[in-house]
C-alpha cells in the first residue's frame, strides 16, 4: 500500500469508525457464561473479533448476525470441538480462552497465525497450571498451538507481576470454575472492561477500593445476558486524532467514542504536548462514552513513563507524534511493547529512521528527536496492524509505502476507506 502526501486540510465529523475491539471480544466470550440470548449492536466486524465468534460457535453457541448486530445463544454445555480453535492474530482471544477453557470439561486446541503462535502465553498457562490446569504446548506451554484438557481448578490468591487486562480476565474466568473463593491483584490498574461488563452481568466479583484487587466467587448460576451497544474504539480513533493534529488547518470531531479512563491516557499525553484536543462525556452506562474534538496543533517533546499499560496500543502512533514534536521525547517502562504483534520498540525505531527521523531504542522504550526533515520511504509493518496504521498517518505528510497492510483488517477493516474519504490518495 502506498500513501501519498496530502496537500489539503482535513475537516470531518466521524461517527462510524471501528467498534471497540476489547469490548467486542468480551461480549462474545462472556456470553458463554449465560443461558439466554445476548445482543450487541455495533459489534466489530474485523478478522480478530470474527474469529472469536467462530470460536464460540465451535464451542456450541448459535450466532445470528445482520451487519454489525450480533445475537448469541449460548449452549447448555460447552462442546469439546473436533477442530482447532483459530484465534488468528488475536492475543486477547487466545489468552481469554485459555482462562475460560482451563476449567471446562473437554479437550481443546488453540492456535493462531504465525505471529500469534510466537507470542508469550506462559503468563497465563503457568499460574493456571499451578492451580490444576492441564495445558500443553511448545516451550513449556509458552507458545501456541496449545492443548487444554479441562480440569476442576483449585482456588488461588494470585498477584500478577505485570499489569495486563488479558492476564486479569483469564484468571477471573478460571476463578469462576474454581473450588472456592479466589483473589487476584495487580501492581497497577490495567484496562477494566472485564470488571465493568461482568458487574453489569451480576457476576460474583468484588473490586477493592483502589481497583487493584478482586475477589471472585465460583459461579453458582448463569450470569445475566447482555443487551448492549458497543462504543467506538479510542485506540482506532487515535489515528485520525493524530492526522488532524499534524495536518495544517485541520479539524476532526469523533463521536460515540469509548472514554474509559484506562483508555484515554494517550489522549492526555497529546494534551500535555500542546494538542488542541477536547473530550466530552455524553453517556455513562456500564462504560463512559463521549466525543472528541481536535484541531491542528504544534506539539512539544515529552517524557512518558507512567500508566504505560493504558497506552500500549497507542504507543506506535504516539511515536509518530514524538517525531513531529519540537525537541526530544521518550517513552520508558514499556517493555511489554517487545512482545506485542511485533517488537514495537525495534520496529518503530527501524521505520522512523527510514523516514529520516532520529530515533534510538531503549531496553524498555525509545527516544525520538522531533523536527527532523521527513523523507518518503518504504517501511515494513511486520504484520502488525498498529505499525501499518501509524505509518499510514505519517504518510499523509511525506508519502510512505507499506509492505504489508492487509494486517490492518484484523482490527480496523474500514481504516483505508475512512482515510480515503478524508482526501488521502492511496494505491492499495
Swiss-Prot record:
Which CDD domains does the annotation name?
EPSP_synthase
- To which pathway does this protein belong? Metabolic intermediate biosynthesis; chorismate biosynthesis; chorismate from D-erythrose 4-phosphate and phosphoenolpyruvate: step 6/7
Q: Which UniProt keywords apply?
A: Amino-acid biosynthesis, Aromatic amino acid biosynthesis, Cytoplasm, Transferase
- What does it catalyze? 3-phosphoshikimate + phosphoenolpyruvate = 5-O-(1-carboxyvinyl)-3-phosphoshikimate + phosphate
The protein's matches in SUPFAM superfamilies, at most eight in alphabetical order, are given as:
EPT/RTPC-like (SSF55205)
Gene Ontology biological process terms in this record:
amino acid biosynthetic process; aromatic amino acid family biosynthetic process; chorismate biosynthetic process
Q: Where is the active site?
A: 313 (proton acceptor)
In its keyword annotation, does this UniProt entry include Protein biosynthesis? no
Say which enzyme class the record assigns.
transferase
What are its GO cellular component terms? Answer: cytoplasm
Q: Please tell me where this protein is predominantly located.
A: cytoplasm
Q: Which domain of life does the UniProt lineage start with? A: Bacteria
Q: Mind telling me which InterPro entries this protein's record contains?
A: Enolpyruvate_Tfrase_dom, Enolpyruvate_Tfrase_sf, EPSP_synthase, EPSP_synthase_CS, RNA3'P_cycl/enolpyr_Trfase_a/b
Which GO terms label this protein's molecular function in UniProt?
3-phosphoshikimate 1-carboxyvinyltransferase activity
Q: Where does phosphoenolpyruvate bind?
A: 21, 91, 119, 166, 344, 386
Assigned EC number:
2.5.1.19
Where does this one sit in the cell?
Cytoplasm
Asked whether the UniProt record includes Ribosomal protein among its keywords, one would answer no
Q: Where does 3-phosphoshikimate bind?
A: 21-22, 26, 164, 166, 313, 340
The record describes its quaternary structure and partners as: Monomer.
Q: Which family does it belong to?
A: Belongs to the EPSP synthase family.
Name under which the protein is recorded: 3-phosphoshikimate 1-carboxyvinyltransferase
Question: What lineage, starting at the top, does this entry show?
Answer: Bacteria, Pseudomonadati, Campylobacterota, Epsilonproteobacteria, Campylobacterales
**Gene symbol of the encoding locus:** aroA
Amino acid at each position: 500500500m502506498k500513501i501519498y502526501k496530502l496537500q489539503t486540510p482535513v475537516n470531518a465529523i466521524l461517527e462510524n469508525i471501528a467498534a471497540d475491539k476489547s469490548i467486542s471480544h468480551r461480549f462474545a466470550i462472556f456470553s458463554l457464561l449465560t443461558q439466554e440470548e445476548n445482543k450487541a449492536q455495533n459489534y466489530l466486524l474485523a478478522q480478530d473479533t470474527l474469529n472469536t465468534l467462530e470460536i464460540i460457535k465451535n464451542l456450541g453457541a448459535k450466532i445470528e448476525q445482520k451487519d454489525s448486530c450480533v445475537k448469541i445463544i449460548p449452549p447448555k454445555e460447552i462442546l469439546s470441538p473436533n477442530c482447532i480453535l483459530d484465534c488468528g492474530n488475536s492475543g486477547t482471544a487466545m489468552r481469554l480462552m485459555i482462562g475460560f477453557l482451563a476449567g471446562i470439561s473437554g479437550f481443546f486446541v488453540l492456535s493462531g497465525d504465525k505471529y500469534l503462535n510466537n507470542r508469550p502465553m506462559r503468563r497465563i498457562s503457568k499460574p493456571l497450571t499451578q492451580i490444576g490446569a492441564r495445558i500443553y504446548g511448545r516451550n513449556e506451554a509458552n507458545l501456541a498451538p496449545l492443548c487444554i484438557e479441562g480440569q476442576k481448578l483449585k482456588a488461588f490468591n494470585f498477584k500478577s507481576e505485570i499489569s495486563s487486562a488479558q492476564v486479569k480476565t483469564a484468571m477471573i474466568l478460571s476463578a469462576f470454575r474454581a473450588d472456592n473463593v479466589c483473589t487476584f491483584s495487580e501492581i497497577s490498574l490495567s484496562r477494566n472492561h472485564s470488571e465493568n461488563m461482568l458487574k453489569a452481568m451480576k457476576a460474583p466479583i468484588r473490586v477493592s477500593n483502589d481497583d487493584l484487587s478482586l475477589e471472585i466467587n465460583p459461579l453458582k448460576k448463569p450470569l445475566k445476558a447482555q443487551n448492549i451497544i458497543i462504543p467506538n474504539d479510542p485506540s482506532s480513533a487515535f489515528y485520525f486524532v493524530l492526522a488532524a493534529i499534524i495536518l495544517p488547518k485541520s479539524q476532526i470531531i469523533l463521536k460515540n467514542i469509548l472514554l474509559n479512563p484506562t483508555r484515554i491516557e494517550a489522549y492526555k499525553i497529546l494534551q500535555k504536548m500542546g494538542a488542541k484536543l477536547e473530550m466530552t462525556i455524553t453517556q455513562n452506562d456500564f462504560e463512559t462514552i463521549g466525543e472528541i474534538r481536535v484541531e491542528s496543533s504544534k506539539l512539544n517533546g515529552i517524557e512518558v513513563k507512567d500508566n504505560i499499560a493504558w497506552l500500549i496500543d497507542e504507543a506506535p502512533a504516539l511515536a509518530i507524534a514524538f517525531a513531529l514534536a519540537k525537541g526530544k521525547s521518550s517513552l520508558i517502562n514499556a517493555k511489554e511493547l517487545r512482545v506485542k504483534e511485533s517488537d514495537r520498540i525495534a520496529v518503530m525505531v527501524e521505520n522512523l529512521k527510514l523516514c529520516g527521523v532520529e530515533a534510538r531504542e531503549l531496553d524498555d522504550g525509545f527516544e525520538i528527536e522531533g523536527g527532523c526533515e521527513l523523507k518518503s520511504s518504504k517501511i515494513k509493518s511486520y504484520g502488525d496492524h498498529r505499525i501499518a496504521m501509524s505509518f499510514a498517518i505519517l504518510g499523509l505528510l511525506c508519502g510512505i509505502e507499506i509492505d504489508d497492510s492487509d494486517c490492518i483488517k484484523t482490527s480496523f477493516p474500514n481504516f483505508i476507506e475512512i482515510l480515503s474519504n478524508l482526501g488521502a490518495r492511496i494505491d492499495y
